[in-house]
Amino acid sequence: LTAIPPVNDNLLATAQAVYKAWFVEYKPFGGNCPISWRVGSVDEIAEFFDSMRKPLSSLERADMARIYPYYGAVSIVDYVDDYIFDGEYLLLSEDGIYVVDDSGHPLLQHIIGKFWANNHAHILKGKAGFTEDSLYLFLSNTNMSPIVTGAAQPKINQANLKSFPITIPDSEVLDRFNSIVHPLFDRKLNNEKEIRKLETLRELLLSRLVS
């Protein structure tokens, strides 16, 4: 279990370095932003599934079998006996103690598999040529502090997120970029899935030892 997180950190760092080279330094394009690129909005590249979220109280979860992860704003909160989502999604923190990091970048979870989510995170999938991998990299490198509202309870509401401006490259560039970063994310997500399996097995073995 302890060996996998450093590997995943390196995989993500590599993907972030590729993003920086392409979309910050524009190295494949002679150091200049191509004129064919444009500024669009998040709702042009992300599909929202917030209407499918369903919060469960701790009392509701107490009697459930611990099978599927139950996600909150920034992490797994619990495990439950059913799931709402099945596939690859991004969860972007909607409200909580923190919704952006020190650089103003949104807090994201990149998930694959069956899971439940409460209403403290926006549920997204890529569209218009954006995969969940490229959507993750574009959003995680975007300063969204201007749309964070609320002093006591910071929040990024859906309307502000959908309309937030973001750079959209042409489809050929995006396809090439996707082909480079996908193997990195694929390995990272598979590693995380293996971690969850091992953690579940460990919990099962421990419960049998004390019963």
Predicted regions and their residues:
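DNA target-recognition domains and sequence-specific DNA-contacting regions of bacterial/archaeal
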Residues: 33-34, 38-169
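Non-catalytic DNA-recognition/assembly elements of restriction-modification systems
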Residues: 1-55, 60-73, 167, 171-211
